[in-house]
């Protein structure tokens, strides 16, 4: 949100650009993305879910009756096939809200999984005050500790989930080159929050995400 306020101060007076408050972008992303996810599963699976709660039930039933890893893999593929574009991306606030919401959705559907399609069953992800929050079964906040195997698994999972969504699902265009730069920076910062150590001294390399955020009219 600080980047968004800077964006408004720098550009707003010149071209009428305004920062969208976090509670608005959070509400918009939650209401729209959840409906789109339900529609996409209905389209691909031939289901007739009317609500997100019905979708949760259908996925859990399929997990119980079929190969769990295959179900989780397909469900992730369906969500990762979504394409969300903001044609006036500004500082990227809406795209960040969508990024966090998609991860929260995967967590609620119990398909937020590591590279082996094993779920992060001991933690739940949700969006609070426009921030992605991860808590354990006792309500404790997740904190990354590289020497802890489970903590490392969770951090790597969140990093790669964000990377996948940023590279495949999120697109933005803006006529203002400064806003494009801020949007790119904002997405990089979201990814950096879950950067992890490949060994004791080396952090995982951040990907090139410029391809999805373009300057244009």
Question: What are these language model-derived features?
Answer:
Residues 210-213:
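AMP-binding/adenylate-forming catalytic domain of the ANL superfamily
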Residues 1-165, 179:
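Class I S-adenosyl-L-methionine
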Residues 101-105, 189-190, 194:
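Signature of the SF2 helicase/ATPase Hel1-core->accessory helical subdomain module
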Residues 171-173:
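Conserved SAM-binding motif I beta-strand of class I
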Residues 194-208:
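Coupling/hinge elements of helicase-like and P-loop NTPase modules
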Residues 183:
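Conserved SAM-binding loop
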Residues 176:
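Conserved SAM/SAH-binding beta-strand->alpha-helix loop
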